[in-house]
């Protein structure tokens, strides 16, 4: 299951391993369409942590990583940004993006 993290625990959440963060907002249509894709991805890739950050309730991480459009997906490896994707993506595209960093 994909969980929402807050700005208070964001840094700890990305500190180790492969972590895909979905920057989203409740009012964003494409963000809502991405949710089932991320749930399927989480089931298929259990070694990758997939989390969401609501940019309205937790704006600091979005500002820190210069997120200007949503949905924005950022892949972190051991706390460092290694990939970024903006907009709605399908599961296969996300698997390719992640597989480059395993």
Curated annotation (Swiss-Prot):
The Thioredoxin domain, residue ranges: 1-102
Claim: Electron transport is one of the keywords in the record: yes
S-S bridge residues: 28-31
InterPro entries per UniProt: Thioredoxin, Thioredoxin-like_sf, Thioredoxin_CS, Thioredoxin_domain
One Gene Ontology term from the biological process aspect of the record: cell redox homeostasis
Recorded GO MF terms: protein-disulfide reductase activity
Keyword vocabulary terms for this entry: Disulfide bond, Electron transport, Redox-active center, Transport
Family label: Belongs to the thioredoxin family.
Function: Participates in various redox reactions through the reversible oxidation of its active center dithiol to a disulfide and catalyzes dithiol-disulfide exchange reactions.
This protein's name: Thioredoxin
Species the sequence originates in: Chlamydia trachomatis serovar D (strain ATCC VR-885 / DSM 19411 / UW-3/Cx)
